[in-house]
Amino acid sequence: PLSSVEGQTQARLLRYLGYDVPDDEPMLFGKVRRLDERLLRALDIDTRSVGEIFRPQESQFQFLADDLYIDEWGIKRRFTGMYWDIVENPLKNATCADLDRYRWPDADSIDPAQIEAHVRRARELKEAGEYVVCAEHPVYGVFELGCWLCGFDDFLMRLFVDEPFVRKLFDIILNYQK
């Protein structure tokens, strides 16, 4: 029921339908571009999504250049025109001891006001009674983070040959998700 669309595509469609559209800017990975309300109404879409990936204030997040940043998990990403591709997996070939030394994001530093804003929006939509309200996941999953932190090849191999590492990594991620 959730929908999103790449920004340039949405802008072209809105212009085609006769709407004014501001210039588009690339979004960070994990941030979902909300479909423009005018487009949702024009297409008679009866769902509205609420939520986003929460970014803790205490993490490794930093911009390195206009097209390069390190996300809250320490994963380096480069904007390649449409997507933010992973260019560095910080835990590739890591050991269990490396997991102990790694700088993990602090879930307790997520701004409570950010969470409350989504709760308010969900309540407003529910009380209006016009749409099905769909919540988005506020954190990434354990499997995808494993692949992104270690690299797909490294992590998939570890699933079969390094159970202690995988269990420890999953415990850390699941503890963050609490």
Where are these regions (language model features)?
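Catalytic cores of TIM-barrel enzymes
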Residues: 1-178
